[in-house]
């Protein structure tokens, strides 16, 4: 579990410039130094350890925790640690409705499965070069946007977010659906939007890595507690039909997009 030394070495205590802050974060601020707010690491440590246990217990109950972080310095670490603990993730961009309109998202994931099946059974080789190219492009796009959640069959039980300001749409959707939000809170964040806040820097690469690493560790610890009672879920994959293949091909040729890009 995280230590005070870990927090200091990773720069978790460095907040934003004093002109860029949310007054609601005042209770988590230790002071100010050279125009930068310094976060109270005693509180960070306390909240971190409490939240670690919450996440561990959720994983022990078999719950799904979705990792969300699309900014450059977060994407790589977020994907790495989500995969290490076997949880879904979004690190490219958040499509509007990923949780509130999950049925439509599942339909898009199905299209990805259809294209992969066409590659597997060789039916894509029967198409023209242009048709095959358009399908390949669509597959790449679907993988970038939805690859991290392709095995998520239902809405998540909890989300872990890096930068709640940037990922405001994801946080809004979670709040609307009453899905608990776990997140580091920098000095420009609104703590009222987060169920389990951890005051800390959400910009520095080492700080982001530490948060992702600890959440993955908590999840793996919870999964280990569950192993003795765990049962494999039945494989309920639906057979892909020729009609589905045709629909995906027609859509690819019309270059139809999906979802709305978060600003």
Curated annotation (Swiss-Prot):
The keyword Protein biosynthesis does not apply. One of its GO terms (molecular function) is structural constituent of ribosome. This is Small ribosomal subunit protein uS2. Residues 223-249 have a biased composition (Basic and acidic residues). One of its GO terms (cellular component) is cytosolic small ribosomal subunit. Belongs to the universal ribosomal protein uS2 family. Residues 222-263 are annotated as: Disordered. Keywords: Ribonucleoprotein, Ribosomal protein. One of its GO terms (biological process) is translation. The gene is rpsB. Coiled coil: none annotated. InterPro entries: Ribosomal_uS2, Ribosomal_uS2_bac/mit/plastid, Ribosomal_uS2_CS, Ribosomal_uS2_flav_dom_sf.
